[in-house]
Amino acid sequence: MDYSKVASEVITAVGKDNLVAAAHCATRLRLVLKDDSKVDQKALDKNADVKGTFKTDGQYQVIIGPGDVNFVYDEIIKQTGLTEVSTDDLKKIAASGKKFNPIMALIKLLSDIFVPIIPALVAGGLLMALNNFLTSEGLFGTKSLVQQFPIIKGSSDMIQLMSAAPFWFLPILVGISAAKRFGANQFLGASIGMIMVAPGAANIIGLAANAPISKAATIGAYTGFWNIFGLHVTQASYTYQVIPVLVAVWLLSILEKFFHKRLPSAVDFTFTPLLSVIITGFLTFIVIGPVMKEVSDWLTNGIVWLYDTTGFLGMGVFGALYSPVVMTGLHQSFPAIETQLISAFQNGTGHGDFIFVTASMANVAQGAATFAIYFLTKDKKMKGLSSSSGVSALLGITEPALFGVNLKYRFPFFCALIGSASAAAIAGLLQVVAVSLGSAGFLGFLSIKASSIPFYVVCELISFAIAFAVTYGYGKTKAVDVFAAEAAVEEAIEEVQEIPEEAASAANKAQVTDEVLAAPLAGEAVELTSVNDPVFSSEAMGKGIAIKPSGNTVYAPVDGTVQIAFDTGHAYGIKSDNGAEILIHIGIDTVSMEGKGFEQKVQADQKIKKGDVLGTFDSDKIAEAGLDNTTMFIVTNTADYASVETLASSGTVAVGDSLLEVKK
């Protein structure tokens, strides 16, 4: 890569006079611009050395890749005369140019709290779907499977119990996550959640030791009253509730910080938890619980009223608006609302989650429009992007399709809205609802009410068919000049570059051989496409896997050479003896910690053996900084291989386990 040339091209594209400040992390340039609209996006999209771009938190980020980004950055500093700044300083510069938006702040808060507990709700919801499958009449004749095969009734009852638990004890889950977000002790947050469900639990235990969870012990159920200093306080149980526990734990965090600052260390350990919990507990049952329960009920009932009143027309409008909402980030607040809808369904007071159904229709429509672009465009880079992001959208992750393809051409985005609106309206007419959270796409049928699954599948197919047909038809008739110009450019490029590209490709592939890459750290393996960073989830840096660490040490996954060892200790670039170029990136946006909590054990150009220690990190410090410690394990020269396969896409992995396999 010609670093000076790439830097010059980036500067030209964003505008030299438009640049305010620049920093870089392990993979990308981070720029603060005066006006994002002045960027020549087409020039950057056409640049083979630029792997992608996106905007977040007031920063315009240009993906270059490990081992190259620091040299490109140096050239940008040299050519512009800007002062070098850290990523943390860049955040402050970006923030200073933005006005505080309370709505966006609330959305981010809700997202931070609810995203970590979604797996528990997904598990509970899917178990509920399984129980519905076993107990619903009409799916397999006039009788349910349990009625036809009584021997499975015990298993069905146990599944029902397990499915109800995450929702019944939802305040405990929310209490833990909210405490972490508000900076309180997570176990105290859990305690507040337990206190809020305790009256209902005590009621059930008192009724019968082996009785199933009854609807009597649902939202607002109570066993009597307390006389608190003359006040008649209801012994209410806040099972299935979200808003009351959020406010209660927020108060807990304020009290805990207050007492930590003012109590002597000799008594702080004992009295801070005691005073924080007892004050929060009393205020929860006397004030917070009753008031916030009413607010929660108004919110849920209002949404249900809107659904009941507008019917399929309202669903159609929502289907058209969902993707534009995703562009603004407002959809991050939906899990909190959906949790309430699902909880209401669980306790028999609601219809179910129609937001999930609408989201699924919208995601599939955007994916279909992206696939239409695959067949319309002659641009090889766009073909690759549209195929990968199209699959991603069909599985529920639409950002790569939206920002990388559909919004670039504009018309696919609007054509997809026609498909999503039509399918959502039909789903509303058929009263298709979800009973759990999950993947809002083709796999979303796992979250749908059992009796509605066939209708859901039909609606998904309708969404795909309409969006694909309208996009392809418009592209062939109205946007033909756009793709003709692309084809001409692509042919000219191929004529100039065909021979050197073939030679380079042959040389690169000759230098790599098949090999298996070992897990560099212990933890839980998760799909790379699910991580909360578009640079990695879009696979712009290459294919790989992510790990939620259970330890604090990073080990060499192969025999090879350290190409990059960042001073911040948060990322390592390695080239194996067999040619695989590997990036290990500890955490998301952890470059902003500037090395705090990280210790680097190797240097650039150092030879390493599989199992050698590369460095250590402190997950607690990463959490204290409000960051995610999910670690990316990526093959950055993916293009040199015929395939990069994950050998363990989920579940627990140990250091040294076979994790990725690369084949020529």
Curated annotation (Swiss-Prot):
UniProt keyword Transmembrane present: yes
PTS EIIC type-1 domain location: 108-492
GO molecular function, one term: protein-phosphocysteine-trehalose phosphotransferase system transporter activity
Keyword Ligase in record: no
InterPro entries associated with the record: Dup_hybrid_motif, Glu_permease_IIB, PTrfase_EIIB_Cys, PTS_EIIA_1_perm, PTS_EIIC, PTS_EIIC_1, PTS_IIB_1, PTS_IIBC_sucr
Function: The phosphoenolpyruvate-dependent sugar phosphotransferase system (sugar PTS), a major carbohydrate active transport system, catalyzes the phosphorylation of incoming sugar substrates concomitantly with their translocation across the cell membrane. This system is involved in sucrose transport.
Protein name, entry field: PTS system sucrose-specific EIIBCA component
Gene this chain is encoded by: scrA
